[in-house]
Regions:
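Asp-box/BNR beta-propeller blade signature and adjacent active/binding-site loops
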Residues: 1-282
Length: 282
């Protein structure tokens, strides 16, 4: 790895709060890499040459706590961006759509607001057959479980937010489909009564498990946090050989050093074997 400071616009140093990178392709097959941040006014930079050079464009101007925590491509080639904002004492999840590869975005609208709860940090993804969108959300009161909602019409309407399975209770979910189509979703554990509370974990199960609020197959403690819950916000990738790479910021040593960016690699073949051995011991 190497730093890219010299390639970034000078004003990028003023962008604040969890910059997030997304690749988008417009209807003319033009590819762009976008980096959105939260403040001021959801600023952004863009690269049209695969990240070699970058330029700043006008901010989106959307009021937010955090920028897009999820961007999902729709069947018509447009993209849906989801984020959250403060509304008085409540939190709201909003969505906006781009039809030109990220250059312009529609007026945002609220898609999740739950009395007595605080939905935020949405992660949207497709069902294996591509027909349904699922959106997992952090529940920021941390008094119960995380939240999820579903859409069968490409995000035009969403179901009423409901509790996730206990094992998916946490912050800033991000997931991938493994080569066998099982879901691997990583997050900061916030499940009440969990032995891995505040650590960096992953949930393994099927989409049907999630859709029907079943527990899933098992959970994995990926990394121990030595700074309480100050970890997570992962990136997730599946390599061609099926290896899952989960990357997070975390304080992974009990010393004076602060957080590092750490990647952990595993295959479901390995974790399945560990789970089988554990079950046999029990």
């Amino acid at each position: 790895w190497k730093r890219l400071d010299d390639a970034l616009p000078p004003n990028f140093k003023t962008h604040r709060n969890c910059p997030s990178i997304y690749r988008m392709v417009d209807s003319q097959c033009k590819e762009r890499l976008w980096v959105f941040s939260a403040q001021p006014r959801m600023p952004r930079i863009v690269s049209e040459d695969g990240g070699t050079t970058w330029k700043e464009t006008e901010p989106l101007g959307f009021e937010c706590v955090m920028t897009f925590s999820s961007v999902v491509r729709l069947n018509d080639g447009s993209y849906l961006g989801l984020y959250h904002r403060q509304a008085g004492s409540a939190l709201q999840v909003l969505q906006t759509r781009t039809t030109d590869g990220g250059l312009s975005w529609s007026e945002p609208r609220v898609v999740a607001e739950v009395e007595g709860k605080a939905p935020c940090e949405p992660f949207a993804f497709r069902s294996p057959d591509g027909k349904e969108l699922c959106c997992l959300m952090r529940e920021n009161t941390h008094q119960g479980r995380s939240l999820m909602m579903f859409s069968l019409d490409e995000g035009q309407t969403w179901s009423r937010p409901q509790d996730t399975p206990w094992g998916l209770t946490g912050d800033r979910h991000m997931g991938v489909y493994a080569s066998d189509k099982r879901l691997v979703i990583a997050f900061r554990d916030k499940a009440q009564g969990s032995s891995t509370y505040d650590h960096f974990v992953a949930w393994v199960g099927t989409y049907d498990d999630l859709r029907n609020c079943r527990p899933g197959q098992y959970r994995i403690k990926l990394l121990r946090s030595y700074a309480g819950g100050d970890c997570g916000y992962p990136g997730m990738e599946v390599l061609p050989d099926g290896t899952v790479v989960a990357t997070t910021y975390i304080k992974y040593r009990p010393d004076k050093e602060k957080q590092s960016v750490v990647s952990t690699r595993f295959t479901l073949k390995e974790t399945d074997a560990l789970q089988q051995a554990r079950s046999a011991d029990e």
